[in-house]
Amino acid sequence: EYANDAYGGSMGFPSMGATLYQKFADFVNNNAAIVKSYGMIPRAWNDGVYYGSYTSYFDPAIEINYWSSGWGGYTLAKASTLDSKGHGLINTNGDYYFILGKDDRFTPGTSTEHDPYEYDFCENFDMNRFMDGSVIEEPLGGMFCIWADYPGAETEQEVAANIRLVLRA
Protein backbone atom coordinates (compact mmCIF):
# COMPACT_ATOMS: atom_id res chain seq x y z
CA GLU A 1 0.00 0.00 0.00
CA TYR A 2 2.86 2.37 0.81
CA ALA A 3 4.37 2.11 -2.67
CA ASN A 4 1.05 2.06 -4.46
CA ASP A 5 -0.16 5.15 -2.62
CA ALA A 6 3.14 6.97 -3.04
CA TYR A 7 3.84 6.04 -6.65
CA GLY A 8 0.41 5.32 -8.12
CA GLY A 9 -1.41 2.29 -9.40
CA SER A 10 -1.07 -1.29 -8.24
CA MET A 11 2.57 -1.71 -9.26
CA GLY A 12 4.23 0.78 -6.92
CA PHE A 13 7.36 -1.16 -5.97
CA PRO A 14 8.58 -1.75 -9.54
CA SER A 15 8.16 1.99 -10.17
CA MET A 16 10.34 3.04 -7.23
CA GLY A 17 13.85 2.13 -8.30
CA ALA A 18 16.61 1.15 -5.85
CA THR A 19 17.08 4.57 -4.22
CA LEU A 20 13.42 5.08 -3.37
CA TYR A 21 13.09 1.44 -2.35
CA GLN A 22 15.93 2.00 0.14
CA LYS A 23 13.92 4.89 1.60
CA PHE A 24 10.97 2.51 1.96
CA ALA A 25 13.20 -0.04 3.73
CA ASP A 26 14.50 2.70 6.04
CA PHE A 27 10.90 3.72 6.79
CA VAL A 28 9.95 0.12 7.65
CA ASN A 29 13.07 -0.44 9.76
CA ASN A 30 12.63 2.86 11.62
CA ASN A 31 9.03 1.97 12.44
CA ALA A 32 10.11 -1.51 13.53
CA ALA A 33 12.61 0.09 15.92
CA ILE A 34 9.86 2.23 17.44
CA VAL A 35 7.61 -0.82 17.90
CA LYS A 36 10.47 -2.77 19.51
CA SER A 37 11.26 0.16 21.85
CA TYR A 38 7.81 -0.37 23.39
CA GLY A 39 8.48 -4.06 23.98
CA MET A 40 6.32 -5.21 21.08
CA ILE A 41 7.09 -7.30 18.01
CA PRO A 42 6.95 -5.55 14.63
CA ARG A 43 4.99 -7.30 11.91
CA ALA A 44 4.54 -6.61 8.19
CA TRP A 45 2.80 -8.13 5.18
CA ASN A 46 5.23 -9.71 2.74
CA ASP A 47 4.40 -7.57 -0.33
CA GLY A 48 7.30 -5.13 -0.15
CA VAL A 49 9.87 -6.97 1.95
CA TYR A 50 12.81 -7.93 -0.31
CA TYR A 51 10.71 -7.08 -3.36
CA GLY A 52 12.03 -8.23 -6.74
CA SER A 53 15.78 -7.78 -7.15
CA TYR A 54 16.11 -4.94 -4.61
CA THR A 55 18.76 -5.70 -1.99
CA SER A 56 17.82 -3.34 0.86
CA TYR A 57 18.08 -4.79 4.36
CA PHE A 58 15.05 -5.39 6.59
CA ASP A 59 15.37 -6.00 10.33
CA PRO A 60 14.92 -9.77 10.82
CA ALA A 61 12.99 -9.04 14.03
CA ILE A 62 10.08 -8.06 11.77
CA GLU A 63 7.65 -10.97 11.64
CA ILE A 64 6.17 -11.47 8.19
CA ASN A 65 2.55 -12.27 7.39
CA TYR A 66 3.06 -14.17 4.12
CA TRP A 67 -0.14 -13.77 2.13
CA SER A 68 0.83 -13.61 -1.55
CA SER A 69 3.42 -15.02 -3.91
CA GLY A 70 2.86 -12.22 -6.41
CA TRP A 71 0.83 -11.70 -9.55
CA GLY A 72 1.36 -10.68 -13.18
CA GLY A 73 4.76 -8.97 -13.10
CA TYR A 74 4.66 -8.24 -9.37
CA THR A 75 7.59 -10.27 -8.04
CA LEU A 76 7.44 -10.96 -4.31
CA ALA A 77 10.13 -12.70 -2.28
CA LYS A 78 9.56 -16.39 -1.64
CA ALA A 79 8.66 -17.47 1.88
CA SER A 80 11.87 -19.53 1.93
CA THR A 81 13.90 -16.38 1.13
CA LEU A 82 12.33 -14.45 4.00
CA ASP A 83 12.89 -17.43 6.30
CA SER A 84 16.57 -17.64 5.28
CA LYS A 85 16.98 -13.94 6.15
CA GLY A 86 15.81 -14.66 9.70
CA HIS A 87 12.22 -13.44 9.61
CA GLY A 88 9.62 -15.39 11.53
CA LEU A 89 6.77 -16.27 9.16
CA ILE A 90 3.03 -16.43 9.72
CA ASN A 91 1.12 -18.30 7.03
CA THR A 92 -1.72 -16.02 5.95
CA ASN A 93 -2.24 -17.69 2.56
CA GLY A 94 -4.23 -15.32 0.37
CA ASP A 95 -6.06 -18.17 -1.34
CA TYR A 96 -7.99 -18.60 1.88
CA TYR A 97 -8.88 -15.03 2.73
CA PHE A 98 -12.51 -14.36 3.38
CA ILE A 99 -13.43 -11.07 1.74
CA LEU A 100 -16.78 -9.55 2.65
CA GLY A 101 -18.88 -9.03 -0.45
CA LYS A 102 -16.82 -11.42 -2.64
CA ASP A 103 -19.08 -14.46 -2.19
CA ASP A 104 -16.27 -16.39 -0.49
CA ARG A 105 -17.41 -19.73 0.86
CA PHE A 106 -15.52 -22.65 2.34
CA THR A 107 -17.36 -25.89 1.79
CA PRO A 108 -16.02 -29.39 2.47
CA GLY A 109 -15.33 -31.35 -0.71
CA THR A 110 -14.55 -28.30 -2.82
CA SER A 111 -11.39 -26.33 -3.49
CA THR A 112 -11.00 -22.60 -3.96
CA GLU A 113 -10.83 -21.07 -7.41
CA HIS A 114 -7.13 -20.20 -7.08
CA ASP A 115 -6.03 -23.27 -5.11
CA PRO A 116 -2.65 -24.27 -6.59
CA TYR A 117 -2.44 -27.44 -4.52
CA GLU A 118 -5.91 -28.76 -5.43
CA TYR A 119 -6.96 -29.60 -1.92
CA ASP A 120 -9.78 -28.55 0.30
CA PHE A 121 -8.79 -25.99 2.90
CA CYS A 122 -11.37 -27.23 5.38
CA GLU A 123 -9.81 -30.67 5.42
CA ASN A 124 -6.19 -30.34 4.33
CA PHE A 125 -4.66 -26.94 5.10
CA ASP A 126 -0.93 -27.37 5.83
CA MET A 127 0.42 -24.50 7.92
CA ASN A 128 3.97 -25.34 6.77
CA ARG A 129 3.16 -24.92 3.04
CA PHE A 130 3.08 -21.30 1.96
CA MET A 131 1.29 -19.81 -1.04
CA ASP A 132 4.43 -19.87 -3.20
CA GLY A 133 4.94 -23.59 -2.51
CA SER A 134 7.74 -23.05 0.02
CA VAL A 135 7.67 -25.44 2.94
CA ILE A 136 8.82 -23.82 6.19
CA GLU A 137 9.56 -26.33 8.93
CA GLU A 138 8.84 -24.05 11.87
CA PRO A 139 6.58 -21.13 10.96
CA LEU A 140 5.39 -18.93 13.80
CA GLY A 141 1.84 -20.00 13.01
CA GLY A 142 -1.04 -19.47 10.67
CA MET A 143 -3.75 -16.86 10.52
CA PHE A 144 -7.15 -16.88 8.87
CA CYS A 145 -7.88 -13.39 7.57
CA ILE A 146 -11.20 -11.66 7.04
CA TRP A 147 -11.00 -8.56 4.88
CA ALA A 148 -13.78 -5.98 5.04
CA ASP A 149 -13.34 -4.60 1.52
CA TYR A 150 -17.10 -4.08 1.48
CA PRO A 151 -17.95 -3.79 5.19
CA GLY A 152 -21.71 -3.51 4.71
CA ALA A 153 -21.92 -6.50 2.38
CA GLU A 154 -22.62 -9.09 5.06
CA THR A 155 -23.93 -9.12 8.60
CA GLU A 156 -21.91 -10.58 11.46
CA GLN A 157 -24.25 -13.57 11.43
CA GLU A 158 -23.68 -14.16 7.69
CA VAL A 159 -19.91 -13.97 8.11
CA ALA A 160 -20.06 -16.36 11.07
CA ALA A 161 -22.12 -18.85 9.04
CA ASN A 162 -19.78 -18.61 6.04
CA ILE A 163 -16.56 -19.18 8.00
CA ARG A 164 -17.93 -21.73 10.46
CA LEU A 165 -16.30 -24.74 8.80
CA VAL A 166 -12.92 -23.04 8.41
CA LEU A 167 -12.81 -22.20 12.08
CA ARG A 168 -13.49 -25.86 12.90
CA ALA A 169 -10.73 -27.12 10.58
Residue ranges and their predicted role:
Residues 47, 54-62, 66-169:
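Flexible, acidic glycine-rich loops studded with aromatic residues
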